[in-house]
Design a protein with these regions (language model features):
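Charge-dense, helix-prone N-terminal extensions
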Residues: 1-165
Length: 165
């Protein structure tokens, strides 16, 4: 039996697919659509993947350093968000950013189409512009699996058990 040599990129894509498959089929489809839209919008950005206890995250960065991520696709069993690590510094005239911490802000995404709204595009442009390291004008970013936690919250909403009386 022949085995096919896999490149690190193939392996990373396979691992990413495995992370996304933990979600319901509808949520997985939405995650893939948002990722494709962000990849089209930010082709030179590196994708840093974290499948942690609470959230599945793909950070978009001009380098391979997590601290240089300017935007993140964040998903859990309840929905998808676009987060900005330095979101408190972003101009938000439409008032769509949520969150009250010192730095992080996010928006909820109903679908990938939300990324094409002018106010969301403006936030992405501003986040890229305020990045510590400029995003390359050309080229294709790398997919890097940074962390997959062994213990995770369920990625699918489960029905609550009936209360005993």
């Amino acid at each position: 039996m022949k085995t096919r040599a896999t490149s690190p990129k193939d392996n990373a894509e396979d691992q990413l697919a495995g992370c996304i498959e933990k979600f319901t089929p509808e949520m997985a489809k939405a995650i893939r659509a948002v990722r494709a839209a962000l990849r089209k919008r930010l082709p030179a950005a590196n994708e840093l993947v974290y499948d942690n206890y609470n959230f599945f995250v793909i950070g978009y960065s001009s380098t391979l350093r997590p601290s240089n991520c300017f935007a993140q696709l964040v998903a859990d069993a309840h929905g998808i968000r676009l987060a900005f690590y330095y979101g408190s510094r972003l101009p938000d005239p439409a008032g769509i950013l949520l969150g009250s911490g010192k730095q992080n802000r996010f928006i909820r995404l109903a679908s990938a189409r939300d990324l094409s709204k002018p106010e969301v595009e403006a936030l992405i442009r501003a986040a890229v512009a305020q990045g510590k390291v400029p995003l390359p004008a050309t080229g294709r970013g790398t997919l890097v699996i940074r962390s997959i936690s062994a213990k995770q919250r369920p990625r699918r909403v489960t029905a609550k058990p009936a209360r005993r009386r």
